[in-house]
């Protein structure tokens, strides 16, 4: 499951964060996976990001409207969230990447290998990311926060 989150970074527009859980081999974890249940329910997982959101983006959200909203003076501190957990929402992730709307990615890396499934970061626009912060939890899950440093042409 992946989540998208806008936050006010103190700049002239809202920032967008992608929040996702993925396996070591890059696939979306199954919803009934024990470690995924922790990510979805623990206050150090997705609930933290839900508490800090105002609006929710869904698949088929008009990205051109989002571009305008992001630069609007009245929306500088608005917080939007979207969960990316299926093929439709993966398309939203790809669209956000295509328009370079992602400023930060928070990845919950689950210490399991599925071998097959829905890839989280397949077909995204090439870009470079810097590690901002990492946290490892007692259950083996590692949260890695990446910040976008540039678009690769």
Annotate each language-model stretch with its function.
Residues 2-153:
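Enzymes that bind and transform nitrogen-containing heteroaromatic metabolites
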